C-alpha cells in the first residue's frame, strides 16, 4: 500500500461519519432501523483506520504523509497582504494512533447504545449526533493546520452541546448543555486570538511552516514574550475543551447526557482534544508557557481528585476523575514528559471509556439509579460488568500489569526528574498525592457499587447482566487496559514499540533564549536558534532514566495505601467514614460542595452579569430614555414654535403680499374704464410728465 492510498483512506475515514449523520438525520423518521446504517458506517471507519494505523506505524514509521490543496487566496488583505489559505490532512504517528482510538471507541459506543438507548423517542437522531461528533473529532486529529483544527474544534463543541442536552425536556440537561457551550467559548476565544497572532505573523496556518519560521528566529512582534503569550492563548482552548482549572466546572454537569455519550465525549475524545492540541503545538511552547501549563495541570489534577472523594453519583465520580487525569497529562507536558503524556492519553481513553460504559451497565441494571449509596452487592448480579470495571479501576489506580501503571509511572518519573533537575518538587508531590487519592476514590466507588450487601433490595432483585451488545464493548476496552498491547515489559514501557518506535520526542522550534528546565539551552548544550533539535537536554534524559525506579516504587506504595485505605473504610469498616467526615467537617464540606466553584461563578460572573444587566436597564430607563424623552419634548416645543412662526410670520408675510397686490390692483383698476378718450388722455398726460422730467435733466 503506497502513501497516496493511505491519504485517500484517511479522507474516507474522515467523511464516512458525516455521511452517516446526513443519511440518519434525513431518513430517521421514515426508516426506524436507519441507525444500523450509521453503525455499519462506524464499523467500516474503524476497519479502515486500523489498516491505516498498521500500515503507517510499520511501513512509514518515520515519514509524515501530507495532502493539501489551496482553498482560497486572500488578495490585498490588511496586515497579511496576499495569502493563500491551504487545507489538508497529515498522517504522522500521533494522528494515526488518535484516529484509531477515536474510531474504535466511537464504534463501541455506537454498539453499546443499541441496547442502552432502546425505546428512546429520538433513537435515530441520537445516532446521527454521534456521527457528526465523530466526524468533527476525526477532523481535529487529521488536520495539518490550525485553522482547520479550529473549525473542527467548534464543530466538536456544537455536537457535544447537542449530545449533552439530548434529553432537553429535563431542565438540568438543557442547562448542562448551555453551560458546556458557554464555558468552552471562553477558552475558544483565547485560542482564536492566539491563532490570529500566528497568522498575522507567519501568513500561514500550517503547523510545519509555523514551526519552521519560529526556528528561523521569526517571532510574533519580534519578541519571545509574545511567543509565550501566543502559546498560552492557544492553550486556553485546551483549558476549556479538556475541562482544566478554572474552566473545569462544565464537565461534571455534562453527565446529564446519555451515559454512552459520557464515554465517548468526556473520557476518550472531546476532552482529550485539548491534550492533543498541546501535543500538536508543543514545539512552539516556550519555557514560561510550559511552566504555566504545568501549574494549570497540577491544579486540575489535584482539585477534582479531592472533589471525587465525596461524590455519590457514579458518573460524577468518574467525571471528576477524568478532569484529574487530564490534569495529569497537561502537567506531564509542562514538565517535559511528552511521550508519557500522550501514552496516558491513549491508555486513559480505553480504561475510562470502559468505566463510563460500565457505569452505564450498572445504571441500566438498576433502572437508572446513579447514587452509589443505593447500590451494593452487584458483583453477584453483574459479574462481567464487575470484572471489566475492576480491571479498568486497577489500570487508573496504577496497579502493575495494567496500561495505566506504565503510563502513570512515566508521568510520575517525569515530575521526579523535573524536581531533580530544577529543585522544584511541587509537581512530583502533586503527582504522587493525586495517585493516592485516585486509588482511594476509585476503589471506594467499586466497593460501594459492587461489594457488600444490597442497599436497595427491590432494585437489586430486578438487576441483571447487560445484553451482549453492551457487554462486548466492556470486554474489548478492559482487555486494552492490559500492558502487553503497548510493551512486552510489564514494568517499563520505554523499550516497547509504543514509545521507542511510534511516539518520539518532538523537535524544538523555540529560540534558545526561551528554553530552560528540561529543554536544551545555551547554558547546558548550546544549539543554534535556527536549527531543529530534539527537545530534551541530556541531563533531563538522564534524570528521567534515574527517576524510573524510585518513581515506580513510590507510585506502588501510594496506590497500595489508597486501595488499602478504601477497603479499611468501606469494605472492612475499621474506620468510620461518617465519623471521619465529622472530624474534618470544613474540609469535607469543601470537597462535597466542589470547592464552591459553581457558587463563586454564579455570584461573580452570573450574578455580576445580572447586576450589570440591571444597571444597563436603569441606565436605559433613566439616562437613555431621559435623553430620548428630553429630545422628544424639545422637538415638540420646537415644532410648536415652528407652527406659530409659520402661522404668524410666514403666513402673515404671504398674506400681506397678497393684500398689497390686491390693494395695488384695486388702485389701478380705477384707470381701466374701457373708454379710448380716457386712455388717450393718460397717454398725453404721461408724455407731458416725461418731457418735463427730461427737460429737468
Describe these PLM feature segments:
Residues 1-9, 26-128, 202-222, 249, ...:
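Transmembrane helix-loop-helix hairpins at membrane boundaries of multipass inner-membrane proteins
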Residues 40-58, 187-198, 389-397, 473-498, ...:
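Hydrophobic alpha-helical membrane-insertion segments
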Residues 2-15, 31-36, 83-101, 139-152, ...:
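Membrane-entry segments of alpha-helical transmembrane domains in multi-pass membrane proteins
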Residues 108-149, 158-469, 486:
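Hydrophobic transmembrane alpha-helices and their helix-loop junctions in integral membrane proteins
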Residues 241, 398-403, 408, 484-495, ...:
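Juxtamembrane "helix exit" motif at the C-terminal ends of alpha-helical transmembrane segments
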Residues 10-17, 34-48, 95-102, 126, ...:
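Hydrophobic alpha-helical transmembrane segments of polytopic
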Residues 13-28, 107, 239, 243:
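N-terminal signal-anchor/start-transfer transmembrane helix
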Residues 80-84, 491-557, 568-697:
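Aromatic-capped, Gly/Pro-kinked transmembrane alpha-helices
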Amino acid at each position: 500500500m503506497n502513501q497516496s492510498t493511505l491519504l485517500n483512506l484517511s479522507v474516507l475515514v474522515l467523511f464516512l461519519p458525516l455521511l452517516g449523520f446526513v443519511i440518519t438525520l434525513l431518513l430517521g423518521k421514515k426508516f426506524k432501523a436507519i441507525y444500523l446504517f450509521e453503525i455499519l458506517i462506524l464499523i467500516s471507519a474503524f476497519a479502515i483506520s486500523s489498516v491505516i494505523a498498521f500500515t503507517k506505524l510499520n511501513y512509514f514509521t518515520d515519514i509524515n504523509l501530507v495532502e493539501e490543496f489551496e482553498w482560497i487566496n486572500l488578495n490585498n488583505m490588511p496586515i497579511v497582504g496576499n495569502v493563500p489559505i491551504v487545507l489538508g490532512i497529515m498522517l504522522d504517528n500521533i494522528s494515526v494512533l488518535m484516529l484509531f482510538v477515536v474510531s474504535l471507541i466511537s464504534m463501541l459506543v455506537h454498539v453499546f447504545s443499541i441496547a442502552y438507548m432502546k425505546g428512546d423517542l429520538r433513537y435515530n437522531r441520537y445516532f446521527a449526533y454521534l456521527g457528526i461528533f465523530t466526524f468533527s473529532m476525526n477532523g481535529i486529529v487529521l488536520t495539518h493546520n490550525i485553522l482547520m483544527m479550529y473549525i473542527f474544534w467548534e464543530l466538536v463543541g456544537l455536537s457535544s452541546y447537542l449530545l449533552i442536552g439530548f434529553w432537553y425536556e429535563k431542565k438540568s440537561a438543557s442547562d448542562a448543555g448551555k453551560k458546556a457551550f458557554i464555558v468552552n467559548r471562553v477558552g475558544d476565544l483565547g485560542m482564536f486570538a492566539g491563532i490570529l497572532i500566528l497568522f498575522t505573523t507567519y501568513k500561514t496556518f500550517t503547523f510545519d511552516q509555523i514551526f519552521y519560521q519560529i526556528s528561523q528566529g521569526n517571532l510574533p512582534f519580534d519578541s519571545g514574550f509574545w511567543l509565550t503569550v501566543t502559546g498560552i492563548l492557544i492553550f486556553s482552548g485546551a483549558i476549556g475543551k479538556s475541562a482544566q482549572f478554572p474552566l473545569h466546572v462544565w464537565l461534571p454537569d455534562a453527565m446529564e447526557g446519555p451515559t454512552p455519550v459520557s464515554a465517548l465525549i468526556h473520557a476518550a475524545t472531546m476532552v482529550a482534544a485539548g491534550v492533543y492540541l498541546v501535543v500538536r503545538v508543543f514545539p512552539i511552547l516556550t519555557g514560561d508557557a510550559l511552566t504555566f501549563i504545568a501549574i494549570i495541570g497540577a491544579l486540575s489534577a489535584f482539585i477534582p481528585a479531592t472533589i471525587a472523594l465525596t461524590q455519590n453519583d457514579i458518573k460524577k465520580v468518574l467525571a471528576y476523575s477524568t478532569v484529574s487525569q487530564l490534569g495529569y497529562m497537561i502537567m506531564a507536558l509542562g514538565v517535559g514528559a511528552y511521550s508519557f503524556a500522550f501514552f496516558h492519553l491513549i491508555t486513559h481513553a480505553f480504561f475510562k471509556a470502559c468505566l463510563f460504559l460500565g457505569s452505564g451497565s450498572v445504571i441500566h441494571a438498576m433502572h437508572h439509579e446513579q447514587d452509589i449509596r443505593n447500590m451494593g452487592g452487584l458483583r453477584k448480579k453483574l459479574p462481567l460488568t464487575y470484572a471489566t470495571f475492576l480491571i479498568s479501576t486497577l489500570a487508573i489506580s496504577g496497579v502493575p500489569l495494567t496500561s495505566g501503571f506504565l503510563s502513570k509511572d512515566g508521568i510520575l518519573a517525569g515530575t521526579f526528574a523535573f524536581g531533580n533537575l530544577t529543585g522544584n518538587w511541587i509537581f512530583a508531590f502533586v503527582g504522587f498525592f493525586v495517585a493516592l487519592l485516585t486509588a482511594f476514590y476509585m476503589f471506594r466507588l467499586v466497593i460501594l457499587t459492587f461489594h457488600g450487601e444490597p442497599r436497595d433490595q427491590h432494585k437489586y432483585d430486578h438487576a441483571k447482566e447487560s445484553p451482549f451488545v453492551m457487554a462486548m464493548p466492556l470486554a474489548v476496552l478492559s482487555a486494552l487496559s492490559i500492558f502487553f498491547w503497548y510493551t512486552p515489559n510489564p514494568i517499563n514501557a520505554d523499550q516497547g514499540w509504543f514509545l521507542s518506535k511510534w511516539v518520539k520526542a518532538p523537535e524544538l522550534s523555540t529560540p534558545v533564549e526561551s528554553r530552560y528546565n528540561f529543554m536544551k539551552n545555551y547554558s547546558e548544550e548550546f544549539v543554534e536558534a535556527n536549527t531543529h533539535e530534539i527537545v530534551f537536554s541530556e541531563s533531563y534524559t538522564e534524570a528521567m532514566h534515574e527517576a524510573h525506579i524510585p518513581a515506580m516504587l513510590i507510585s506502588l506504595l501510594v496506590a497500595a495505601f489508597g486501595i488499602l485505605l478504601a477497603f479499611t473504610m468501606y469494605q472492612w469498616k475499621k474506620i468510620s467514614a461518617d465519623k471521619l467526615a465529622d472530624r474534618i467537617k470544613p474540609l469535607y464540606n469543601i470537597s462535597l460542595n466542589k470547592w464552591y466553584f459553581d457558587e463563586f461563578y454564579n455570584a461573580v460572573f452570573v450574578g455580576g452579569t445580572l447586576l450589570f444587566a440591571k444597571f444597563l436597564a436603569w441606565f436605559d430607563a433613566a439616562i437613555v430614555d431621559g435623553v430620548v424623552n428630553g429630545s422628544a419634548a424639545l422637538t415638540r416645543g420646537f415644532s410648536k414654535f415652528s407652527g406659530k412662526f409659520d402661522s404668524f410670520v410666514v403666513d402673515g408675510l404671504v398674506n400681506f403680499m397678497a393684500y398689497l397686490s390686491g390693494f395695488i390692483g384695486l388702485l389701478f383698476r380705477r384707470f381701466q374704464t374701457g373708454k379710448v378718450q380716457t386712455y388717450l388722455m393718460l397717454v398725453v398726460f404721461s408724455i407731458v410728465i416725461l418731457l418735463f422730467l427730461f427737460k429737468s435733466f
